[in-house]
């Protein structure tokens, strides 16, 4: 039974090693903050913020050096808060060109093959004109004065973004299509051998 628990832990180890808000929003000329949570096992690794439709081809904007010091590249800064396993990215002086797909990523040193990927999570950045009176209900930073209907819509949209981020994660795909079938096969073999 301990073997089964150990194998199950191995299967789920990389699945949720890095999580993020899914989507954040801000105004032109303003700033926004993104916080991504990572597994404590990645403490001391370099973290970075990159832009692009895919995590494997995104262009690095700013990165840490493995310490907790804030690093800056133009209007974008990143800081690794190792004490609570959080990466904080701040984008300032926003323009509509800043809207798009970004990634929180962790630089790992044990990747040797094309099947492995750095742990990453997608974050959609929305930038709205400064004349907009309130942010749409799809933002991660809703004011509490919104009606309950907008809050329910926001919660549903955020869940969909987070679910899509999980499903597009290579760790999740490896879990579902490789580790889980292998685990189930080994579990069946154990039960079959014990039955004899």
From Swiss-Prot:
Keyword Membrane listed: yes
GO CC terms: plasma membrane
Residue spans, topological domain Extracellular: 18-171
Subunit composition and interactions: Interacts with TYROBP.
Parts of the chain that traverse the membrane: 172-192
GO BP terms, alphabetized: immune system process
Gene3D superfamilies, per database record: Immunoglobulins (2.60.40.10)
Residue ranges, Cytoplasmic side: 193-196
Family: Belongs to the CD300 family.
Function in brief: Probably acts as an activating receptor.
Segment forming the signal sequence: 1-17
Locations listed in the record: Cell membrane
Membrane topology, as annotated: Single-pass type I membrane protein
Source organism of this protein record: Mus musculus
Domain Ig-like V-type, chain residue ranges per copy: 18-122
Name of the protein in its database record: CMRF35-like molecule 2
InterPro entries in UniProt: CD300_family_receptors, Ig-like_dom_sf, Ig-like_fold, Ig_sub, Ig_V-set
């Amino acid at each position: 039974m301990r073997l089964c628990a150990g194998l199950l832990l191995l299967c789920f180890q990389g699945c949720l090693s890095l999580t993020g808000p899914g989507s954040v929003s801000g105004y032109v000329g303003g700033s926004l903050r993104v916080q991504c949570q990572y597994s404590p096992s990645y403490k001391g690794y370099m973290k970075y913020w990159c832009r692009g439709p895919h995590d494997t081809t995104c262009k690095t904007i700013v990165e840490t050096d493995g310490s907790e010091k804030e690093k800056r590249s133009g209007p974008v800064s990143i800081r690794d808060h190792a004490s609570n396993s959080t990466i904080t990215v701040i984008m300032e002086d926003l323009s509509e060109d800043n809207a798009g797909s970004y990634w929180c990523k962790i630089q790992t040193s044990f990747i040797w093959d094309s099947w492995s990927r750095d742990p990453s999570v997608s974050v959609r950045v929305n930038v709205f004109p400064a004349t907009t009176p309130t942010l749409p209900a799809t933002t991660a930073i809703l004011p509490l004065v919104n009606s309950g209907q907008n809050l329910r819509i926001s919660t549903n949209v955020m869940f969909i973004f987070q679910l899509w981020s999980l499903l597009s994660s290579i760790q999740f795909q490896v879990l579902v299509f490789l580790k889980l079938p292998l685990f189930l096969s080994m579990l069946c073999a154990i039960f079959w051998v014990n039955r004899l």
